[in-house]
Amino acid sequence: MQKDGTRSSRRMEEGDRRNGSTGSSGSVSRELGRGFSYYNKYLARLQQNLRDTKRFFRDIKHTYSGAPGGPDTDIKGAEGDLGQLHSITFPRQEEEYLKLTVRCRPCIFILGQSCSSRGRVANSLLGDQLLPILTHCGSECCKRRRIRFRYGKQTLVSLALPEQYELVHELVAHQGKWDTIPEEDLDVPEDEEDPAHRLAELEVTLPHQLLQDVDIVVSPCRSSQAVSMTLEDYVDHVQSIVVYAVCEERLSQQDEEELTEIKEKYKLPVFFIRTSSTRDRLIGGSEGVRSALYEQLMELGFLKRGLCNCGAAGSGSTAPSMLVEQFEKLRQVSTFSRQVLQMHLVDAAIVLNMVHSRCLDLFINKAFDMHRDLQITPKRLEYTRQKENELYESLMRISDRKQEELKDMIVETLNSMREQLLEDAANMQFKDIAIPQNGEPVSVQEVKCCIFQIKELIISRLNQAVVNKLISSVDYLRESFVGTLERCLRSLEKSQQESSSHVTSNHLKQILNAAYHVEVTFNSGSTVTRMVWEQIVQIIQRITWVSPPTITPEWKRRVAQDAIESLSASKLAKSICSQFCKRLKSSHEAFAASLKQLEVGHSGRLEKTNDLWLRVRKDHAPRLARLSLESRSLQDVLLHGKPRIGRELGRGQYGVVYLCDSWGGHFPCALKSVVPPDEKHWNDLALEFHYMRSLPKHERLVDLHGSVIDYSYGGGSSIAVLLITERLHRDLYVGLKTGLSLETRLQIALDVVEGIRFLHNQGLVHRDIKLKNVLLDKKHRAKITDLGFCKPEAMMSGSIVGTPIHMAPELFSGKYDNSVDVYAFGILFWYICSGSVKLPEAFEKCASKDHLWNNVRKGARPERLAIFDEECWKLMEACWNGDPSQRPLMGIVQPMLQGIMDRLCRAQETGKALEDST
């Protein structure tokens, strides 16, 4: 079997008719064509975003892999530098799903109760009588095979195995002209024994405009092949649109089983169309009567009560099934197909955006970690060096002044232990020495061993007592210095990835443990032990015997007494202090050398971390944020459509705000149109959008409903991003001009503080708190808007942004934190307390922005007005303090402001009450 190069081909004589250009069937074809054009437009955008996403992950992988493009290429190869960035990958499951989605071609499956009903639907879709309408509808003897209509420049008919190859077979259609496909070619011959020919489908290629966008597959008769086999052959590599033609009043049991299998196995929505002409079949008539077919579909779970059966989209993630009981309304299949394809695109856009958002959050979290590492590691190193030096000096001072105390401690210890030592010595049982029970003398050698063991007892007891008292005298140093040092070293060791640095850190910890746990011991080779042993030898030499003594308790007690009296407390104290100082100095020098080595290792690591932080902040995160903005905007426009722009509400430096009556179920809305002029503005806008979408809803922040990218803005000359937000009554600037009561103004201040505090808790800095960025609802409650400059501290580059009169002095240095919002609130609070929008005198005198900035840097601030309450003025001054570290946190400002409001408003109410009483 091979491709038939001699198969019949002819051009259709009625090209216009075959292209669906006339009659009601032609309108169905045109409606479907428009729906597929809509699908193809957004599919192209999804494909482009997916290509850009794959390129992004490929670039990340190659940038941080030791062997770009190699077989073992993996971002984990740079895990030492990247940390969390090794998980910035395109998950395989999501990637395969998205690849399949964008490659799948739409396909309309025409199923149904009979060949006649299926043929009628196919003819109507194609606008021509291509399939014969049989009279023996549903006959068991029907053997019609599967039919597939595809696009081709010429009209061709052939037999082919699905997605494989064509069969060499002479068809009736090859023998001459035809308008309707011959029935002989449509049916499987009863005497056909070749299984390939029995399973083959009739493939028809037509130069039909509709077929450029979609294939049409007409299922075979049940006696020829089960419907499930048709779906099984195609469903995994096409976007399925299922049409079910009904020619009877009710579904048969076999129909129900067939539909149940489709629903449970493939979970596909179905468009049901009744092909027979009947009377009074309008669903939802004046009496609200439902047909038997409708009730059956309800029981099967294809239709739901409360949903319009005409195809209105539900709120779920899948398109609903539809029932149309008038064949004249077949054009509604275009609405159904559009919903089905749209939900495929929406699902793909959601998956793609989830990948973008997850990886973008990882980038931002890693930026936080790197930023903190860059800030804290040098401080930890300096802190470790400083604390170790303090510990060293403290211990040296202790050693210098403790010698006399040690002498007294030794004397005191010996006196307190004397009786117990003598008693223990008298009762001592010697090891490895046999003492006669009858009191006979022992040899000189055995006497020496006995004296040595008595010495060992005295030395061990004295050592333990002296060391315990010495350690207790420096315990506070061990707790306050050594514990902190060890914690800092553990932290530095974790952040240093090189193996050599692990050795250095471990060695450093060992030195600390050896040097600073102050364990004074009398080793066998130590000066103290030798000194004590010499004294014991002198004791032995002083005892002269004519013959070896008898080992009695009295003798043991006398030997112990002489040994104790021979010990010199001053010499012992001097020896202990000398040994302690020597070990301390040696350990201090080793510590300093090891710390220097560790610092060198961290210096190289921090340099790499800083480079990576800059790349994440300036390249990786903005690039991924733009892809995220595109995928989320695609999802929003598919679900809710393009918003209708109303009258202009205002304009700012970066965009125009319009009225938008309703969008996505929200009413009313405001629409901010932004046309980014360059890549930097695109990146800033994309990151702003991500931060806003990532924030939990908060009553003191303006809600962002969604975004749409308008590729046709300005006649297609530029691209605009439309941000749809909730619409409020007015901004604070207009509110103050109109006039607001003191209580209302203080409540607005509290609302602003609550909003700023929430942003700070989320790790964000607004950077542009001002009158026009505070919106008021009809109840005069405030919400913060315009997060255009809002960023996490770790993602800030030090850009000079904001509105001049609200900008903190440190903004001009490029090194600042969230305290710039506290400063801006202080200026805003000045306006709130003044009750007007008049500029402060110090700012009004400035002729230019540069003049204003210079004055602010020099300490210029708004003046105190006569109407200001003392506590309000102190709060303003605290907020705009020139030293950022002296400004109060918003968590402190909020209760202070609440107290001011309670006091002032209560005073006002008391005054009014007094006036009323008079």
Curated annotation (Swiss-Prot):
Its main location: cytoplasm. It is found in: Cytoplasm; Cell membrane; Apical cell membrane; Basolateral cell membrane. Residues 1-19 have a biased composition (Basic and acidic residues). GO terms for biological process: embryonic organ development. ATP binds at L649, G650, R651, G652, Q653, Y654, G655, V656, V657, K672. It comes from Xenopus tropicalis (Western clawed frog). CDD domains: PKc_Dusty. Residues 1-29 are annotated as: Disordered. Its EC number is 2.7.12.1. The active site is at D768. GO terms for molecular function: ATP binding; protein serine kinase activity; protein serine/threonine kinase activity; protein serine/threonine/tyrosine kinase activity; protein tyrosine kinase activity. It catalyses: L-seryl-[protein] + ATP = O-phospho-L-seryl-[protein] + ADP + H(+); L-threonyl-[protein] + ATP = O-phospho-L-threonyl-[protein] + ADP + H(+); L-tyrosyl-[protein] + ATP = O-phospho-L-tyrosyl-[protein] + ADP + H(+). One of its GO terms (cellular component) is basolateral plasma membrane. Belongs to the protein kinase superfamily. Ser/Thr protein kinase family. This is Dual serine/threonine and tyrosine protein kinase. The gene is dstyk. The lineage of its organism: Eukaryota, Metazoa, Chordata, Craniata, Vertebrata. Residues 643-897 form the Protein kinase domain. Keywords: ATP-binding, Cell junction, Cell membrane, Cytoplasm, Developmental protein, Kinase, Membrane, Nucleotide-binding, Serine/threonine-protein kinase, Transferase, Tyrosine-protein kinase.
